[in-house]
Amino acid sequence: MVRLDAITLKQLRALVAVAGSASLTGGATRLGLTPPAIHSQIRNLEEAFGVPLLHRPPETGSFTPTLAGIAVLEAAQRIEVILSQCSYQVMAVSEGRAGQVTLGVVSTGRYFAPRLVKMLSLACPEIRIALRVGNREQLIDDLARHMVDLAVMGRPPRQPEVASVALGPHPHGIVAPPDHPLAGLAEVPVPDLLSQTFLARAEGSGTRVLMSRYLDRLGEGQVVDLIEMDSNETIKQSVIAGLGLAFLSLHVVMDELRFGQLVQLAAPGLPIERHWFLVHPVDRPLNPAALRVQGEIVKLKGAYLPGAPA
């Protein structure tokens, strides 16, 4: 029975060296060993396989591989190739040229995330980008549990503690269908605005938090009619259908505004200008691949954001 756990790389290389030079002396010279040392390596290898691997005919005195030896030599060559490839991959990972990076993006960012990932794949072709999308609360939880390496979001959280860098503008406003009574007004009266029905994401959404603060400040705590919906897409289609108004990231409705399906209302204090941030937890250093991706995202200067030049 072959004892695989007794086989070493040194033994395999000794076999390759002796078979290649046809002598113990030649093989020892190749490896910088003494002939007795290389003979010991081959003997141990033959004992591990349980069969002779080299044959030395008396008439020539040169070592030649047996059929079993040929099989082991071919395996040894494949092992060297695999180790060489592995060495390249390890170096690539350690230098940030390869690896996997999990990028978290808040739900609002799903409208530009594919473009960002495409740009990163061109800049870092050997780094695999895994995208993880969720609302603000989910993303903060992912950061705390180290489920993501980097995250693109609005206002950075207080906990967990993160390092952040601003990526680009993130405007918010109120949108309505083009035939809405408040559409086209130079300035929407506050009482008229607060009397409307608003469509909004559920609690935990960063946009919902910003909307609540804006309406509370505008109405001094006045209760506003609110209908919760599960996604920005549902909200957009509902506004287009005339079910109400919506306070949204203008990046979410860029196409609808461009094609006239929605209009932006001239409400007091709007648009609210926020920023997109790239964040990562400070309690765990970024791996080389994540550092590379971080640098590439910053270098893009928001070129992937809606409305940015193609």
Curated annotation (Swiss-Prot):
Question: What GO molecular function terms would the record report?
Answer: DNA-binding transcription factor activity; transcription cis-regulatory region binding
Q: Which residues bind DNA?
A: 24-43
Q: Extract the InterPro entries matched here.
A: LysR_subst-bd, Tscrpt_reg_HTH_LysR, WH-like_DNA-bd_sf, WH_DNA-bd_sf
Presence of keyword Transcription regulation: yes
Note the PROSITE patterns from the entry.
HTH_LYSR
| One Pfam family from the record | HTH_1
The yes or no answer to whether the keyword Metal-binding is present is no
Q: Which domain of life is it from?
A: Bacteria
Q: Which residues form the signal peptide?
A: none
Keyword annotations? Activator, DNA-binding, Transcription, Transcription regulation
Q: Which residues form the HTH lysR-type domain?
A: 7-64
Q: What does this protein do?
A: Transcriptional activator for the cbb operon for RuBisCO and other Calvin cycle genes.
Which family does the record claim for this protein? Answer: Belongs to the LysR transcriptional regulatory family.
Protein name, per record: HTH-type transcriptional regulator CbbR
The record lists the organism as Cereibacter sphaeroides (Rhodobacter sphaeroides)
